[in-house]
Amino acid sequence: MNLTPKERERLTIFMAAELARRRKERGVKLNHPETVAYISDWACERAREGMSVAEIRQEATALLTREDVMDGVPELVDMVQVEPMFPDGTKLVTIHDPIRADTREQLEE
């Protein structure tokens, strides 16, 4: 299997995100790389499904809460940038302050 550098990068993000998803399901708090991978992978998948850049930026801020990540991670992850493939080509998606809520309940309000 011959993969381009972009395809290898995408697989690396997926693998890190998969590890993060499994840890999150078990109640393990995510570290910085896991948090970035989790958000990046989600954004790439939504782009592939045809969601707009604006929708991805908005909905990505509801993926994780402070309860889901280790102490200090929300401050470290002040921005996530990823270049996913949309149906009409690659675009830069920038998600500012992706971890805004302290708890899941705050997201549901």
From Swiss-Prot:
GO BP terms, alphabetized: urea catabolic process
InterPro entries (UniProt xref): Urease_gamma, Urease_gamma/gamma-beta_su, Urease_gamma_sf, Urease_subunit
One Gene Ontology cellular component annotation held by this UniProt entry: cytoplasm
Gene Ontology molecular-function annotations: nickel cation binding; urease activity
Entry keyword annotation includes Hydrolase: yes
Oligomer status and interactors: Heterotrimer of UreA (gamma), UreB (beta) and UreC (alpha) subunits. Three heterotrimers associate to form the active enzyme.
Keywords assigned by UniProt, alphabetized: Cytoplasm, Hydrolase
Cell location: Cytoplasm
Protein name: Urease subunit gamma
NCBIfam families xrefs: PRK13241.1, urease_gam
Pfam family, one: Urease_gamma
This protein's record includes keyword Ribosomal protein: no
PANTHER family cross-referenced by the UniProt entry: UREASE
Catalysed reaction, written as an equation: urea + 2 H2O + H(+) = hydrogencarbonate + 2 NH4(+)
Pathway where it operates: Nitrogen metabolism; urea degradation; CO(2) and NH(3) from urea (urease route): step 1/1
EC number: 3.5.1.5
